[in-house]
């Protein structure tokens, strides 16, 4: 028996080295069972899902280039005399951090290219996360059970902002010094504890002698470590919850239609990584970003025209357009012109973080009837109120971004900086309201157009003249795929307060919270917030040849 059992293994010969290594690992880690459960994981195919991949690959590029830069950067504020290759600054006294950054740019082989790849990848990472979160927001991909993953993504965006700021501050050039001074002023505006926080951060009076080394530790160890953990958790939850998908034939709330992880998706993802790396490298090779040599080292008597940063620019815009109000009481000054924007900044971020929970409470989506493990994504037009809120927020963001760069707008377009400031102040309050109303009306108009397309077909551009002289355009029925896309979305009813009296005829107490929830729910799912989908009877009428041309 033993001889017969051993015959197949003898005829097969010695297993390949890779298989032997895999067998060794499986015997200790059980990788075969893990691979069996995940290698055939299905991923939907849609261009918007690539936004998350851009963020992931940019983060990997940031880590790779950052490791290279740490080999040559000296995080010290000790003053040295510069004797490097950049002639205009030779002989000048500067911090060792600034001198080492100049050496990376001009003396280290490939150093300038790596610096620029690192910087461009950071910007693309932040911009990619911003756009990715907007995609998740507008399509409703944050709904139960994915609220935790929304929080992970939100924390990645916030930590990415602060990681970018600390990295931007490390070279100790004039631009980074201006940003540090801006941050220090914001910290000092905090009543009671602002001074203590500033002394703790800078190790004494600004600028101190330790902030570069402290920011360096935060930039390369603390924040990236937390972000890496959040990123891993984010990906694990994507696998656990399965991927969301847009409506289409064969797609329901109980399945995922797409490509398997191996070999199709992995091959595409690998190619896309090198494509992202290549594009960033080409951009870095031909487009200079953050040149530190023209402005020189930081100094207390110089202030450059600093452009507003991509994500933190809106916080800078808040401070620039806020009136310089102050309150003097009991020998202390409360600088409202800085402190109020400093309060608004975290409040806006907190509102973004908790929005999924607010919507689930308002709309009742968390009720058992609406719990879906793998919900189909919304088309933004089918969620007019949410889409209007998103566009209103984007309006605020871009208005404040203009405020953050008001000096550059004024100099480049020959405008009055006071006029720009007043425009931003007014648009901050008026713009979101106008954007909300306009967006909601546009969404409802698109819903009406979709309903008309389902009932009457699409326009064919064929004009016919009837016997009595009337001209009409012939409409053709839409495809089954289009029909499914236009009618697959669910339409919910707004939450109701219920009867005003109980079963005994006694008036039931209704709390103010219940009334508020019902009113807000009406704004999401009421008659004025969604156009009813065509009924089966209406569709049968069109398919039977009646009611359309």
From Swiss-Prot:
<dbReference type="GO" id="GO:0005886">
    <property type="term" value="C:plasma membrane"/>
</dbReference>
<keyword id="KW-0813">Transport</keyword>
<feature type="binding site" description="axial binding residue">
    <location>
        <position position="234"/>
    </location>
    <ligand>
        <name>heme 2</name>
    </ligand>
</feature>
<feature type="transmembrane region" description="Helical">
    <location>
        <begin position="182"/>
        <end position="202"/>
    </location>
</feature>
<feature type="transmembrane region" description="Helical">
    <location>
        <begin position="122"/>
        <end position="142"/>
    </location>
</feature>
<keyword id="KW-0812">Transmembrane</keyword>
<feature type="binding site" description="axial binding residue">
    <location>
        <position position="118"/>
    </location>
    <ligand>
        <name>heme 1</name>
    </ligand>
</feature>
<keyword id="KW-1278">Translocase</keyword>
<keyword id="KW-0472">Membrane</keyword>
<feature type="transmembrane region" description="Helical">
    <location>
        <begin position="389"/>
        <end position="409"/>
    </location>
</feature>
<dbReference type="InterPro" id="IPR016174">
    <property type="entry name" value="Di-haem_cyt_TM"/>
</dbReference>
<keyword id="KW-0679">Respiratory chain</keyword>
<comment type="function">
    <text>Cytochrome b subunit of the cytochrome bc1 complex, an essential component of the respiratory electron transport chain required for ATP synthesis. The bc1 complex catalyzes the oxidation of ubiquinol and the reduction of cytochrome c in the respiratory chain. The bc1 complex operates through a Q-cycle mechanism that couples electron transfer to generation of the proton gradient that drives ATP synthesis. The cytochrome b subunit contains two ubiquinol reactive sites: the oxidation (QP) site and the reduction (QN) site.</text>
</comment>
<feature type="transmembrane region" description="Helical">
    <location>
        <begin position="417"/>
        <end position="437"/>
    </location>
</feature>
<comment type="subunit">
    <text>The cytochrome bc1 complex is composed of a cytochrome b (QcrB), the Rieske iron-sulfur protein (QcrA) and a diheme cytochrome c (QcrC) subunit.</text>
</comment>
<dbReference type="GO" id="GO:0008121">
    <property type="term" value="F:ubiquinol-cytochrome-c reductase activity"/>
</dbReference>
<feature type="binding site" description="axial binding residue">
    <location>
        <position position="132"/>
    </location>
    <ligand>
        <name>heme 2</name>
    </ligand>
</feature>
<dbReference type="GO" id="GO:0046872">
    <property type="term" value="F:metal ion binding"/>
</dbReference>
<keyword id="KW-0249">Electron transport</keyword>
<keyword id="KW-0408">Iron</keyword>
<feature type="binding site" description="axial binding residue">
    <location>
        <position position="219"/>
    </location>
    <ligand>
        <name>heme 1</name>
    </ligand>
</feature>
<feature type="transmembrane region" description="Helical">
    <location>
        <begin position="54"/>
        <end position="74"/>
    </location>
</feature>
<keyword id="KW-0479">Metal-binding</keyword>
<feature type="transmembrane region" description="Helical">
    <location>
        <begin position="269"/>
        <end position="289"/>
    </location>
</feature>
<keyword id="KW-1133">Transmembrane helix</keyword>
<comment type="similarity">
    <text>Belongs to the cytochrome b family.</text>
</comment>
<feature type="transmembrane region" description="Helical">
    <location>
        <begin position="334"/>
        <end position="354"/>
    </location>
</feature>
<dbReference type="GO" id="GO:0022904">
    <property type="term" value="P:respiratory electron transport chain"/>
</dbReference>
<dbReference type="InterPro" id="IPR027387">
    <property type="entry name" value="Cytb/b6-like_sf"/>
</dbReference>
<protein>
    <recommendedName>
        <fullName>Cytochrome bc1 complex cytochrome b subunit</fullName>
        <ecNumber>7.1.1.8</ecNumber>
    </recommendedName>
</protein>
<keyword id="KW-1003">Cell membrane</keyword>
<feature type="transmembrane region" description="Helical">
    <location>
        <begin position="220"/>
        <end position="240"/>
    </location>
</feature>
<dbReference type="Pfam" id="PF13631">
    <property type="entry name" value="Cytochrom_B_N_2"/>
</dbReference>
<keyword id="KW-0349">Heme</keyword>
<feature type="transmembrane region" description="Helical">
    <location>
        <begin position="150"/>
        <end position="170"/>
    </location>
</feature>
<dbReference type="InterPro" id="IPR005797">
    <property type="entry name" value="Cyt_b/b6_N"/>
</dbReference>
């Amino acid at each position: 028996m033993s001889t017969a059992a051993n015959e197949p293994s003898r005829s097969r010969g010695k297993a390949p080295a890779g298989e032997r290594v895999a067998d060794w690992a499986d015997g200790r880690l059980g990788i075969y069972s893990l691979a069996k459960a995940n290698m055939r994981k299905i991923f939907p195919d849609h261009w918007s899902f690539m936004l998350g991949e851009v963020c992931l690959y940019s983060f990997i590029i940031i880590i790779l280039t950052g490791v290279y830069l740490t080999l040559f950067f000296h995080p010290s504020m000790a003053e040295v005399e510069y004797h490097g290759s950049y002639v205009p600054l030779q002989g000048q006294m500067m911090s060792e951090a600034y001198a080492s950054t100049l050496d990376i740019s001009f003396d280290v082989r490939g150093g300038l290219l790596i610096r620029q790849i690192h910087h461009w990848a950071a910007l693309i990472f932040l911009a990619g996360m911003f756009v990715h979160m907007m995609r998740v927001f507008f399509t409703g991909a944050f709904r139960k059970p994915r609220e935790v993953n929304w929080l992970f993504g939100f924390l990645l965006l916030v930590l990415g902002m602060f990681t970018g700021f600390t990295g931007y501050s490390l070279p100790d050039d004039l631009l980074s010094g201006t940003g540090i001074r801006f941050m220090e002023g914001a910290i000092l505006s905090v009543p009671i504890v602002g001074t203590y926080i500033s002394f703790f951060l800078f190790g004494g009076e600004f600028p101190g002698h330790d902030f570069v080394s402290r920011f360096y530790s935060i930039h390369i160890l603390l924040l990236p470590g937390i972000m890496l953990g959040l990123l891993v958790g984010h990906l694990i939850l994507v696998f656990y919850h399965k991927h969301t998908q847009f409506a289409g034939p064969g797609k329901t709330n109980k399945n995922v239609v797409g490509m398997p992880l191996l070999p199709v998706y992995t091959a595409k993802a690998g190619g896309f990584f090198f494509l992202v790396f290549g594009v960033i490298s080409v951009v870095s090779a031909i487009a200079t970003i953050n040149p530190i040599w023209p402005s020189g080292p930081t100094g207390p008597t110089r202030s450059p025209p600093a452009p507003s940063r991509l994500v933190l620019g809106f916080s800078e815009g808040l401070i620039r357009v806020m009136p310089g109000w102050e309150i003097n009481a009991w020998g202390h000054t409360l600088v409202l012109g800085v402190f109020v924007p400093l309060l608004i900044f975290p409040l806006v971020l907190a509102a973004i973080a908790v929005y999924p929970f607010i919507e689930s409470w308002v709309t009742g989506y968390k009720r058992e009837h609406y719990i879906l493990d793998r919900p189909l994504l919304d088309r933004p037009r089918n969620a007019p109120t949410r889409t209007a809120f998103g566009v209103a927020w984007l309006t605020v963001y871009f208005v404040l971004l203009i405020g953050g760069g008001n000096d550059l707008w004024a100099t480049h377009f020959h405008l009055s900086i006071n006029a720009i400031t007043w425009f931003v102040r007014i648009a901050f309050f008026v713009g979101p309201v106008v954007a909300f109303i306009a967006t909601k009306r546009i969404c409802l108009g698109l819903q009406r157009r979709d309903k008309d397309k389902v009932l009457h077909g699409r326009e064919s551009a064929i004009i016919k003249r009837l016997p009595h002289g009337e001209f009409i355009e012939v409409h053709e029925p839409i495809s089954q795929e289009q029909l499914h896309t236009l009618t697959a979305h669910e339409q919910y009813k707004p939450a109701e307060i219920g009867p005003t009296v109980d079963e005994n005829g006694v008036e039931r107490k209704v709390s103010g919270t219940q009334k508020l929830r019902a009113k807000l729910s009406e704004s999401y799912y009421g008659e004025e917030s969604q156009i009813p989908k065509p009924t089966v009877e209406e569709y049968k009428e069109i398919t039977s040849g009646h009611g359309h041309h």
